[in-house]
Regions:
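Positively charged n-region of N-terminal signal peptides that target proteins for export
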Residues: 1-4
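C-terminal motif of bacterial Sec signal peptides marking the signal peptidase cleavage site
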Residues: 14-17
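Acidic/polar, low-complexity intrinsically disordered N-terminal segments immediately downstream
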Residues: 19-168, 453-455, 465-466, 470-502
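Hydrophobic beta-strand positions that form the internal "hydrophobic ladder"
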Residues: 134, 249, 297, 404, ...
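Preference for solvent-exposed, low-hydrophobicity sequence contexts
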Residues: 164-171, 185-395, 399-401, 414-429, ...
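Repeat-based blade/solenoid architectures
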Residues: 174, 327-334, 384-392, 434-447, ...
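Signature of short aromatic-glycine-proline-rich micro-motifs recurring in repeat-based ectodomains
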Residues: 175-181, 185-188, 238-239, 391, ...
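C-terminal structured domain segments
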Residues: 422-484
Length: 502
């Protein structure tokens, strides 16, 4: 203890000596940087050949002379890449680091007179030329299926490469009718009706032999039949494929609903007896906000009864209303409530379904007790006009606001579901209308960055123009409808699938 007191008594006068001027000026008057903004806390995903541009905003102490500061940008093992305040850096892999690994960086602002430094750290990863940050799968007019690698963020893709199969596997095109796709971090499966392979499994990352991964971006890792499916059934019908990061991934194969761990980076291996959630399944439907926080999935069986499950390894419940089985003819749409809360917290889920020609919007309450999910409770049953319901195509919700959305023809509508106990289409606002010759193929609401959070980023819409057999990506602010970016006719075919890579 004596040594500690002695050390403190020695240091304190030194601090006053360094920070204090004449008459013992308060250390808060020292010229210094007080904050730096404009550098993301999320990991930057960069590509060789691109240019990283960062323009941080600096806040200084009152009265500071901003001409007295120097700047340094360091990456990796203290490699200086710039001495300017704003960074413009041609991306390359620093010495001693591997592709896709986390690389440290720091922005240093130093006062030349008093030597004080402010350091803002960041992290980035470097990927090869073809490594995707987003993927589009599309059908071509020669009855083959292709995929596109897009790099950057949806708000500003820096590069994109179409016809990736033609580039890397020109002798083995993906043939047959597209039935679905499943992303699994390391790989992408494209399912078809083509016998005997029933589709291809494709690497989405570079080889990492030290960790047993031997395939580069775009290379086939195997056929669906033989790599994923390991059973004895001679034919496969895989469809209704969904990937919810942190929740589960699932598809229906030959009327069997198979559900897998949403965190597994590899494509699943299965047969008729493994990963079975239910059999005699007609349809499965989750919210488009499907992820770890909102993971209810409704399962419609061929006999009409509706089940529900929440994670890949739980037991599906048969939903009941007033003690009787919940029975429907079809599931039309689903979206979840924006709560701002994390995983295993209560929320409401909305389901649009039909029975005997009548449509209703059901609101169920999902409750957790000690992190254990409880049976669904019906909160409200709202009649929906049948003619209207049949004209809608997609339903989804905002991650952060109490808004729901649906599409009719080439328009997107927004409605407020806060304290909603009846559904009135007349109260909805037409948010966006696309060109008359463009068909909405699908809609994908996204969250910011690479993590999980109940927060809106943007929504990506796949649009198809039949006259030119081309597809576009339209990116807009999820809540306001404000256009962020449009990538007009960049896809040489009919887009059928989009995913953000993790």
């Amino acid at each position: 203890m004596k040594k500690i007191y002695l050390l403190l008594l020695t240091i304190i006068p030194l601090l006053y000596s360094c920070y204090g001027g004449e008459d013992s000026t308060d250390i808060t008057n020292i010229q210094q940087v007080t904050a730096v903004s404009g550098i993301s806390n999320d990991t930057y995903k960069l590509y060789q050949g691109d240019t990283l541009k960062l323009s941080p905003t600096l806040s200084f102490s009152e009265g500071a002379d901003t001409t007295l500061y120097t700047y340094r940008w360091l990456i990796g093992k203290s490699e200086v890449i710039s001495n300017s305040r704003n960074l413009t850096w041609p991306v390359c892999l620093p010495n001693g680091y591997s592709m896709a690994g986390n690389i440290p960086g720091v922005f240093v602002v130093q006062n030349k007179e008093n030597g004080l430094e402010f350091r803002q750290t960041f992290t980035f990863q470097v990927y090869s030329n073809y490594t995707p940050s987003c993927v589009v799968v599309y059908e071509k007019d020669d009855n083959t299926i292709e995929w596109m690698s897009l790099q950057g963020e949806p708000a500003d893709f820096t590069r994109y490469f179409d016809n990736m199969i033609q580039r890397i596997n020109p002798e083995e095109p993906v043939k047959g009718k597209y039935t679905g796709a499943l992303y699994s971090t390391n790989e992408l499966a494209i399912f078809t009706n083509n016998h005997p392979d029933y589709g291809k499994c494709i690497s989405m990352r570079n080889a990492d032999p030290d960790n047993g991964y031997l395939y580069n971006v775009g290379e086939y890792t195997g056929n669906v039949y033989g790599k994923m499916y390991m059973g004895a059934t001679p034919s496969l019908n895989i469809h209704n494929c969904v990937f919810g990061y942190g929740a589960s991934k699932y598809f229906i194969c030959n009327d069997i609903l198979h559900v897998f761990n949403g965190l597994d980076r590899k494509l699943p291996v299965f047969n008729e007896s493994t990963f079975v959630k239910s059999t005699e399944v007609q349809q499965a439907l989750s919210s488009k906000q499907f992820q770890r926080y909102k993971k209810a999935t409704f399962v419609l069986h061929k006999d009409g009864h509706v089940g529900c499950y929440h994670v890949y390894d739980d037991v599906m419940e048969n939903v009941k209303i007033d003690g009787k089985p919940f029975v429907l003819d079809s599931l039309y749409g689903c979206f979840t409530e924006a709560t701002g809360m994390g995983s295993n917290k209560p929320y409401s889920v909305y389901l649009l379904g039909s029975k005997d020609g009548e449509f209703n919007l059901y609101r169920f309450y999902v409750n957790y007790i000690n992190r254990v999910v409880q049976p669904l409770t019906l909160e409200a049953k709202m009649p929906v006009d049948a003619t209207f319901a049949k004209t809608t195509k997609f339903w989804w919700g905002s991650f952060g606001e109490s808004y729901g959305f649906y599409t009719i023809d080439n328009s997107i509508y927004r409605f407020d579901y806060y304290e909603m106990n009846s559904f009135e289409p007349s109260q909805a606002k037409k948010l966006i209308t696309f060109d008359a010759d463009e068909e909405i193929i699908d809609v994908f609401p996204l969250i910011p960055g690479m993590g999980l959070r109940d927060e809106d980023d943007c929504t990506v819409v796949l649009l198809y123009k039949k006259a030119t057999n081309t597809s576009s990506l339209y990116v807009y602010d999820t809540v306001t409808g404000r256009k962020i970016k449009e990538y007009k006719d960049i896809i040489p075919g009919k887009a059928v699938y989009f995913t953000k890579c993790l």
